[in-house]
Amino acid sequence: SDEDSVRIHQSPVDLGSVKPQIAMASKLKDLGFHAVMTGDGADELFGGYRRAEQYDSQYSDVFCELPYYHLPKLDRTMMYYTVELRSPFLAPSVVKHALDLPYEMRKGIKQKLIDEFAYLLPTEILERQKHPLKTDSIRKDPMSQRIANNEIWKNL
């Protein structure tokens, strides 16, 4: 719920992205998982975006937004449910290696890896399209507005 979002993060957050994180973390805990691996940083480091104009935003994502906004938010959510988050693509050795490669070498490596290991993956995974998270804007969500306007924020 939206109240869970505020309790976990102890501040107003982008409820559109936190709601699915809470649902995922809760389900993982219910299934008995104690740790999960993410692909965070892989697209940014290895040119996983299809459009060339997204390349400029990749630097900002890896060095500005991921470590200071996205990952802490996700980590707080996961740890609330006692599930450890591991991001192997953001290990210092992987980041250094990726940045040492010329961009042309990194571009498209994701598809090369998929092609190489396709025999290990189910068809529904191989053929699944990547979709951005789509949620209602906070301005349109009455529950989000109720939380945002709550008296509790005036005392912080």
Regions found by a protein language model. Give the residues of each.
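ATP-dependent adenylate-handling ligase core
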Residues: 1-31, 51-56, 100-105
